[in-house]
Design a protein with these regions (language model features):
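Single conserved hydrophobic/aromatic residue that forms the stacking wall/gate
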Residues: 1-7, 11
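A short, proline-enriched helix->beta-strand linker immediately N-terminal to the Walker B motif
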Residues: 47-51
Length: 137
């Protein structure tokens, strides 16, 4: 959105700092860990100033330490009031950052509502079974 190279660098660094990798502003993707690559992707998306962000399994291929770095960024974005649509099997993440959860089964809405109602008192048998299997893992 800026025309000069210097202004563009400032803009890029602003968003890289926001996601915790400002020191990597000049690194190549191959020089970044999986979590850093994921956060760089979030910074790129934020540069577009979107009205909503879409995350598709943002932590699924990350080891636990890197996963926590990405989760922190997503939680910070939620605290800012950003609109996010997150496709995830991570029920803790969904419970922590959502104000509305939609549980899908075979591509159809099985149940939806607040995180509190869905996770504490699921109505559908399929959601009950899913939650009990994720709690046991």
């Amino acid at each position: 959105r800026t025309s000069s190279s210097a202004a563009s660098d400032v803009y890029k660094r602003q968003y890289l700092n926001k996601v915790g990798i400002g020191e990597k502003w000049n690194a190549f993707p191959s020089e970044l860990s999986g979590g850093q690559q994921q956060r760089a992707a979030i910074a790129r998306a934020l540069c577009m100033e979107p009205s909503a962000l879409l995350f598709d399994e943002p932590t699924s291929a990350l080891d636990p330490e890197l996963e926590q770095e990405v989760i922190k960024v997503i939680k910070d974005l939620a605290l800012e009031g950003r609109t996010m649509i997150i496709v995830t099997h991570d029920m803790k993440l969904a419970a922590d950052v959502s104000n509305h959860v939609v549980f899908l089964h075979q591509g159809l809405i099985e149940e939806e509502g607040s995180p509190n109602s869905l996770f504490k008192s699921p109505k559908s048998e399929r959601l009950q079974k899913f939650l009990s299997s994720t709690r046991a893992a």
